[in-house]
Design a protein with these regions (language model features):
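Conserved, structured core segments of small domains
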Residues: 2-128
Length: 128
């Protein structure tokens, strides 16, 4: 069992949802509505099982901005940092015993069928 050494709780994992927005844009309104309902049900199931800590879908990539601060000056560009086939579309913050368990949980996230889920363990920062 992977217990966070700082908090003493189960580990937290950020599950980043990626998919090709062109695939989503090609869906019929009924397919899109069905996918959204599946995502809501998935979140509800994860929450009732005590694994869901938070999450949300993101607006399309054309609404994004990237900020870089160089020499104390902000530089903003439209869009994401890098152009890729799959775009960051949402996230789930989950709590699980270990990586194996969170992989099983993330496999139930509906957009995993359409793209990918990147799973990242959370590193808790603690004040001195």
């Amino acid at each position: 069992m992977a217990i966070d050494q700082i908090t003493g709780h189960f580990m937290k994992y950020l599950c980043l949802v990626y998919y090709d927005e062109n695939v989503i844009n090609a869906m019929s309104p009924q397919e899109w509505e069905s996918l959204n309902k599946e995502c809501i049900a998935c979140g509800d199931n994860l929450r009732s099982a005590g694994h869901f800590l938070g999450g949300n879908a993101l607006q399309p990539v054309n609404t994004a901005a990237t900020l870089r601060v160089r020499d104390g000056r902000p530089h903003v560009t439209d869009g994401p940092f890098a152009e890729t086939k799959e775009q960051l579309a949402g996230f789930y913050l989950l709590e699980a015993e270990n990586l194996d368990q969170v992989i099983q949980l993330a496999g139930k996230i509906p957009p995993a069928r359409l793209g990918s889920i990147e799973i990242r363990p959370i590193r808790e920062l603690q004040p001195d």
